[in-house]
């Protein structure tokens, strides 16, 4: 963990990516459940 100055740590990227993926999946399933996903 030496070369972290001026860079974004990998665990931050992984956490943000995981939250975004979970959020997108949640929005997709919510849209499909409420009937909005069929228009996509």
UniProtKB/Swiss-Prot annotation:
Primary localisation category: plastid
Keywords of the record: Chloroplast, Membrane, Photosynthesis, Photosystem II, Plastid, Reaction center, Thylakoid, Transmembrane, Transmembrane helix
Any Pfam family from its record, for instance, is PsbJ
Recorded GO cellular component terms are: chloroplast thylakoid membrane; photosystem II reaction center
Topology relative to the membrane: Single-pass membrane protein
Per its UniProt entry, which superkingdom is the organism in?
A: Eukaryota
- UniProt entry tagged with the keyword Chloroplast: yes
Subcellular location field:
Plastid, Chloroplast thylakoid membrane
Biological process (GO) annotations held by this record are: photosynthesis
Gene3D superfamilies this protein is in? 6.10.250.2070
Stored InterPro entries: PSII_PsbJ, PSII_PsbJ_sf
Name the residues that span the membrane. Answer: 8-28
According to its UniProt entry, what is the function of this protein? One of the components of the core complex of photosystem II (PSII). PSII is a light-driven water:plastoquinone oxidoreductase that uses light energy to abstract electrons from H(2)O, generating O(2) and a proton gradient subsequently used for ATP formation. It consists of a core antenna complex that captures photons, and an electron transfer chain that converts photonic excitation into a charge separation.
UniProt subunit comment: PSII is composed of 1 copy each of membrane proteins PsbA, PsbB, PsbC, PsbD, PsbE, PsbF, PsbH, PsbI, PsbJ, PsbK, PsbL, PsbM, PsbT, PsbX, PsbY, PsbZ, Psb30/Ycf12, at least 3 peripheral proteins of the oxygen-evolving complex and a large number of cofactors. It forms dimeric complexes.
HAMAP family recorded: PSII_PsbJ (MF_01305)
> Which protein family is it in?
Belongs to the PsbJ family.
Q: What is this protein called?
A: Photosystem II reaction center protein J
């Amino acid at each position: 963990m030496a070369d972290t100055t001026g860079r974004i740590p990998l665990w931050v990227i992984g956490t943000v990516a995981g939250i975004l993926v979970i959020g997108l999946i949640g929005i997709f399933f919510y849209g499909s459940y409420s009937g909005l996903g069929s228009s996509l």
